[in-house]
From Swiss-Prot:
Bias type Polar residues, positions: 1002-1018, 1186-1196, 1257-1284
Compartments, record wording: Secreted, Cell wall; Membrane
Chain intervals for the UniProt region annotation (3 X 15 AA approximate repeats, Ser-rich): 892-936
Residue ranges of the propeptide: 1300-1322
Residue ranges of the region described as Sugar recognition: 197-240
Region described as 3 X 51 AA approximate repeats, Thr-rich: 1013-1186
GO biological process, one term: cell-substrate adhesion
Keyword Signal: yes
Name of the protein in question: Flocculation protein FLO9
Organism: Saccharomyces cerevisiae (strain ATCC 204508 / S288c)
């Protein structure tokens, strides 16, 4: 093959590729549902600057639908695309056409552009949809309707970036399935897909042969990757006409109709579309008859087609006009239709219709009647009456009754715009239910006006035929009387091309004008036959007189009748003619409207029917309108009546009035009943005895005068007779935040219906804010404070427990809850007693009574702020009887809340909640008192039975205790309980890890007077034990250990005696009394023994507490001092869990009269820990295993403090002038990795020896040593051994109570125990 032939072949192949001529038959569609103008456009996401995806044919055919659909628009007829990116210049932002681009990035007429041309830009330039035209894929679908049969050539003048076009069913989309997902066909009519790294050629075309009148599916898919977007679309019709861009009238949209049969037309060439055939035939009737006939025609393809033939039959003879006008004596125009039968010249009977119009002979108003009524709107009703015409046929007449309100109101005529071409007036009937519950029909006249100017009922439409067609369409409108009315709409269809008129005028020899319609068939330019209508008007060649005859007669009205005569025309044929005979009365007559007075309160208009016999002997029905007016002036139908209720009642009553014609008429009367006295609306206020305002809603039923019940609502507000707070309640509570809760209460109103009321309770903390205490009055004689627990469900649906503190105060004078009592103690004691009172709500409430016991003797104290020393003097000291425990007993002590203050406003407080359990009969646990303090205080029993227990013994159960020394500013309060738990702080003798001990020796210089303490030997004696229960007392004799101790302070000697029963066996009655005279004060002590009971012991370690039940001996003792009797109760547990002990050797140094001796003795080491405010205290006790009774006298003189430390064996030497105590500890114990200083004396605790305790404080470091008891040290839990520092804030309260401890340390073993515990509490 030569090169020339090869090039020729290549050109042919290229031409065939660019020009895709569809030679095969293209499938068409005939959708049956309603069509819409334009095409649908769907938008899909496309990645910016993606230059490969749109090169894939599968993506352009259907793959785009898998991307994100951005939205869609419809009704698009201008389907070409021309998008220009914006150019941002110094003069503004303007779109820049691609052909105006120059240079690096400039636009002609605009200048240099500063923006980036290859980024995404948003706009509505593509069919009004807001998207990024720079990067998007869109799909256009619709049906192409060819106006001609032949070849249609579609063309893309250029493509930027990629596009395809498909035409035909099964190529673009299936028939009647436009909205379905795209099909997978890649048989494109135009393939404008941009090749990889290339550009598609310009002027790409595709040709499709289509048949006129069929719809062809068409789809266009376009993609743009960046910047400008261009796709100009055009089509060339078979006649050579080119349509570009705007495809108005060629593209349509149909909704999916997948169930439509025969939607697809595979071969339109074999499918015949038939037109309607109109045929005109002459006939012998006197009017034009139009009928529709259905025929089946077999087309050239052998397929039968249904055709519709309209047959118009026109009369062959002349006839007179069928409309007749007659005068009559009524007040309105009546139109009736009469049917007559005429025998034509051909002997065939023909039915003719004569329209008779009867007009009134006198001037009158129309049939519209206006009546006043008492409603608030205008009511228009239509009344139907039947009038029998002169021909004996009944005719329906309509009377419109307009009832206008006596007050201004809007009309009932509504005007609405609509999209049709004519004005429509319809009457709509609505039913309104009045206050009496009866429905009333109302008429609303709705006038719908076209949004564009148009003529009345004549509609003009364009069509593709060559002549003007006028057809009459009959519609039925249902009036307000419920009867259908036929309306006629004349539709004029005009050809879209110019044509000559079809009206022809011909002369003829008859006496009237004849108009007939003739059908001719004209073959159009498309080769199809078209039926045309020619209207032939035949006019008479000679003049003729009319057929109307007027005759006088003797009646009172004008009668018009039609008479039929037969006239032989000039053609020798008989013609039926109609003569209208008008008979007029010879005398004047009045109108038919009659006015009559009557006794009612309104104007009544009724229609009466009378029958009049005319001159022709035929009866004629006449209508007389009777207007009855009231004889006296009256208001409208609204009636006002007074009544005795407190509100205005409006009811609607329905009455029936029978008119003079005997027909009942429904009338509505509105009755307004007003109260005879002034009152507020429906709100009623009533007093009641509660403490809050209640608002309830009550429903009452009022029966109106018409006997119908009416529901009315009365709001009843009940206000308290006494002042009360609102529904917002403020209460204090012990938490740290303000709580607001909503409580729902249900109040049952007088109607028995419960009403929910809401009380807002605001609980505020008692500190740092307003106190929100709620005070309520009650009939009790004291103030009651109760704590109520409520559960409030929050907005998150979770329940929250809230505490409400309610303080109820007595409404009358009652006993004060604070009681003051004298006692023989040396300080003021405040105790709290708990009583249970059942409140008005039936719930028990704990009430607290504070009892203040004041000392009968004065105590003076002095504070030196420079040295921190406190000197306390008691002007009169008395022995205090302190019952001790049996040798095998144990003690359980719980103490809490210790506070102290001095006169210089220096407040030191600590909270302690502890439980101490030890197997030793004496608890060797202490805070060591300073030797510089000289004081004498009395000690009270640590244990007292109470729900919450008390350190201070009283004759009643107590809760809490406070102490204050009247001569100083120091005070302390504590609370203890036999069965008490607290996770905060515990004293426990349970097993402890080893605690490292060190020895400290120091000398304290003091200028205060020395304190001398003497401890005597104990002896056993018999005592009389008085046991009381339920106010019945018995006496018994029991063995007891008697211990005595004396303390001399500044020359004042105090002796302490303790009786401790050692047996609970009851014996013969015997009383042991001890009387001691000291400075004129007499004290008498009696100790009794009660039966054995069971107590609960709480043991706590590492914040874990457990309870055990143990039998205990209950011992009571009474002391009478200056006539004041105090009862002391002691519980001595018989057994308990023994703590882990260690046995070691200690060196006991005994000194007397300046001579000291040392002995070595085994000792039991007991340890206990206490946690107070996260400070861990370890207590160790060395108990020498010897029973030697010792008497120790210690004196404190001024000396120099000296401390030595021995790493081998801890040794502490305390020099006090004449007396010196040396203690050596050979064991080391450690706990919690904290170093603690422990010193132990060689004093035999069991032997109840005691010595002076010393306290030293320097800066913030505190070292405590004891020569007679165990020692301890304090540090926070987290303090390392190298930085253990005591709290300086404890110095004042330690020194305050050290004096009391010093005095007790010189006494008996129990006094030593009490002093140790007192110091430990500090």
């Amino acid at each position: 093959m030569s090169l020339a032939h090869y090039c020729l072949l290549l050109a042919i192949v290229t031409l065939l590729g660019l020009t895709n001529v569809v030679s095969a038959t293209t499938a068409a569609c005939l959708p049956a549902n309603s069509r819409k103008n334009g095409m649908n456009v769907n938008f899909y996401q496309y990645s910016l600057r993606d230059s490969s995806t749109y090169s894939n044919a599968a993506y352009m055919a259907y793959g785009y639908a898998s991307k994100t659909k951005l939205g869609s628009v419809g009704g698009q007829t201008d389907i070409s695309i021309d998008y220009n990116i914006p150019c941002v210049s110094s003069s503004g932002t303007f779109p820049c056409p691609q052909e105006d681009l120059y240079g690096n990035w400039g636009c002609k007429g605009i200048g240099a552009c500063s923006n980036n041309p290859i980024i995404a830009y948003w706009s509505t330039d593509l069919f009004g949809f807001y998207t990024t035209p720079t990067n998007v894929t869109l799909e256009m679908t619709g049906y192409f309707l060819p106006p001609q049969t032949g070849s249609y050539t579609f063309k893309f003048a250029t493509v930027d970036d990629s596009a395809i076009l498909s035409v035909g069913g099964s190529i673009a989309f299936e028939c009647c399935a436009q909205e379905q997902p795209p099909i997978t066909s890649t048989n494109f009519t135009i393939n404008g897909i941009k090749p990889w790294n290339g550009s598609p050629p310009d002027n790409i075309t595709g040709t499709v042969y289509m048949y006129a009148g069929f719809y062809y599916p068409m789809k266009i898919v376009y993609s743009n990757a960046v910047a400008w977007g261009t796709l100009p679309i055009s089509v060339t019709l078979p006649d050579g006409t080119t349509v570009s861009d705007d495809f108005e009238g060629y593209v349509y949209t149909f909704d999916n109709n997948l169930s439509q049969p025969n939607c697809t037309i595979p071969d339109p060439s074999n499918y015949t579309v038939s037109t309607t055939i109109t045929t005109t035939e002459p006939w012998t009737g006197t009017f034009t008859s139009t009928s529709t006939e259905m025929t089946t025609v077999t087309g050239t393809n052998g397929v039968p087609t249904d055709e519709t033939v309209i047959v118009i039959r026109t009369p062959t003879t002349a006839s007179t006009i069928i409309t007749t006008t007659e005068p009559w004596n009524s007040t309105f125009t009546s139109t009736s239709t009469e049917l007559t039968t005429v025998t034509g010249t051909n002997g065939v009977r023909t039915d003719e219709t004569i329209i008779v119009i009867r007009t009134p002979t006198t001037a009158t108003t129309a049939i519209t009647t206006t009546e006043p009524w008492n409603s608030t709107f205008t009511s228009t009703s239509t009344e139907l009456t039947t009038v029998t015409g002169t021909n004996g046929l009944p005719t329906d007449e309509t009377i419109i009754v307009i009832r206008t309100p006596t007050t201004a109101t809007t009309a009932m005529t509504t005007t609405q715009p609509w999209n049709d071409t004519f004005t429509s007036t319809s009457t709509e009937l609505t039913t309104v239910t009045g206050t009496n519950g009866l429905p009333t029909d109302e008429t609303i006249i709705v006038i719908r006006t076209p949004t564009t100017a148009t003529t009345a009922m004549t509609t003009t439409q364009p069509w593709n035929d060559t002549f003007t067609s006028t057809s009459t369409e009959l519609t039925t409108v249902t009036g307000t009387n419920g009867l259908p009315t036929d309306e006629t709409i004349i539709v004029i269809r005009t050809p879209t091309t110019a044509t000559t008129a079809m009206t022809t005028t011909q002369p003829w020899n008859d006496t009237f004008t004849s108009t007939s319609t003739e059908i001719t068939t004209v073959t159009g330019t498309n080769g199809l036959p078209t039926d045309e209508t020619i209207i032939v008007i035949r006019t008479p060649t000679t003049a003729t007189t009319a057929m109307t005859t007027t005759q006088p007669w003797n009646d009172t009205f004008t009668s018009t009748s039609t008479e039929m005569t037969t006239v032989t025309g000039t053609n020798g044929l008989p013609t039926d003619e109609t003569i209208i005979v008008i008979r007029t009365p010879t005398t004047a007559t009045t109108a038919i409207t009659t006015t009559e007075p009557w006794n009612s309160t309104f104007t009544s208009t009724s229609t009466e029917m009378t029958t009049v016999t005319g001159t022709n002997g035929l009866p004629t029905d006449e209508t007389i309108i009777v207007i009855r007016t009231p004889t006296t002036a009256t208001t409208a139908i609204t009636t006002t009546q007074p009544w005795n209720d407190t509100f205005t009642s409006t009811s609607t009553e329905m009455t029936t009035v029978t008119g003079t014609n005997g027909l009942p008429t429904d009338e509505t009367i509105i009755v307004i009943r007003t109260p005879t006295t002034a009152t507020t609306a429906m709100t009623t206020t009533q007093p009641w005895n509660d403490t809050f305002t209640s608002t309830s809603t009550e429903i009452t039923t009022v029966t109106g005068t018409n006997g119908l019940p009416t529901d009315e609502t009365i709001i009843v507000i009940r206000t308290p007779t006494t002042a009360t707070t609102a529904m917002t309640t403020t209460q204090p509570w012990n938490d740290t935040f303000t709580s607001t809760s909503t409580e729902m209460t249900t109040v049952t109103g007088t109607n028995g219906v419960p009403t929910d009321e809401t009380v807002i309770v605001i609980r505020t903390p008692t500190s740092e804010g307003l106190i929100s205490t709620t005070t309520e009055p009650w009939t009790g004689t004291f103030t009651s404070t109760s704590t109520e627990m409520t559960t409030v469900t929050g907005t998150n649906g979770q329940p929250t427990d809230e505490t409400v503190i309610v303080i109820r105060t007595p409404t009358s004078e009652g006993l004060v809850t604070t009681t003051t009592e004298p006692w023989t103690g040396t300080f003021t004691s405040t105790s709290t007693e708990m009583t249970t009172i059942t409140g008005t709500n039936g719930q028990p409430t704990d009430e607290t009574v504070i009892i203040v016991k004041t000392p009968t003797t004065a105590i003076s104290s002095s504070l030196s702020s420079s040295s921190g020393q406190i000197t306390s003097f008691i002007t009169s000291a008395r022995p205090i009887i302190t019952p001790f425990y049996p040798s095998n007993g144990t003690s359980v002590i719980s103490s809490s809340v210790i506070s102290s203050s001095d006169t210089s406003s220096l407040v030191i407080s600590s909270s302690v909640t502890s439980s101490l359990v030890t197997s030793s009969p004496v608890i060797s646990s202490s805070f060591i008192s300073s030797p510089v303090i000289s004081s004498t205080t009395t000690s009270a029993s640590i244990l007292s039975e109470s729900s919450k227990s008390s350190v201070i013994p009283t004759s009643s159960s107590t809760s809490g205790s406070s102490e204050s020394e009247t001569g100083s500013a120091s005070s302390a309060s504590s609370s203890s309980s036999i069965s008490s738990e607290s996770p905060k702080s515990t004293y426990s003798s349970s097993s402890l890890p080893p605690v490292t001990s060190a020895t400290t020796s120091q000398e304290i210089t003091s200028s205060l007077p020395p304190v001398t303490t003497t401890k005597t030997s104990e002896q056993t004696t018999l005592v009389t034990v008085t046991s009381c229960e339920s106010h019945v007392c018995t006496e018994s004799i029991s063995s007891a250990i008697v211990s005595t101790a004396t303390v001399t302070v500044s020359g004042a000697t105090t002796e302490y005696t303790t009786w401790c029963p050692i047996s609970t066996t009851e014996i013969t009655k015997q009383t042991t009394e001890t009387t001691k005279q000291t400075k004129g004060t007499t004290e008498q002590t009696t100790e009794t023994t009660k039966q054995t009971t069971v107590v609960t012991i709480s043991s706590c370690e590492s914040d874990v507490c457990s309870k055990t039940a143990s039998p205990a001996i209950v011992s009571t003792s009474t002391a009478t001092i200056n006539g004041v009797t105090t009862e002391y109760t002691t519980w001595c547990p018989i057994s308990t869990t023994e703590s882990k002990q260690q046995t070691t050797l200690v060196t006991v140094t005994s000194c007397g009269s300046g001579v000291c001796s040392e002995t070595t003795s085994p000792a039991i080491v007991s340890t206990a820990t206490a946690t107070v405010n996260d400070v861990v205290t370890v207590y160790s006790t060395w108990r020498p295993q010897t029973t030697n009774e010792q008497s120790v006298s210690s004196k404190m003189n001024s000396a120099t403090s000296e401390t030595t430390t021995n790493t081998g064996a801890a040794e502490t030497t305390t020099s006090t002038g004449a007396a010196e105590t040396k203690t050596v500890v050979t064991s080391s114990i450690s706990r919690f990795n904290h170093a603690e200083t422990q010193t132990a004396s060689a004093t035999d605790v069991i032997g109840h020896s005691s010595s002076v305790v010393s306290v030293s404080e320097t800066g913030n470091t505190k070292s405590l040593t004891s020569s007679g008891l165990s020692t301890m040290s304090q540090q926070p839990r987290s303090t390392p051994a190298s930085s253990m520092v005591g709290s300086s804030t404890a110095s004042l309260e330690i020194s305050t109570y050290a004096g009391s401890a010093n005095s007790l340390l010189a006494g008996s073993g129990l006094s030593v125990f009490i002093a140790s515990l007192l110091l430990a509490i500090i």
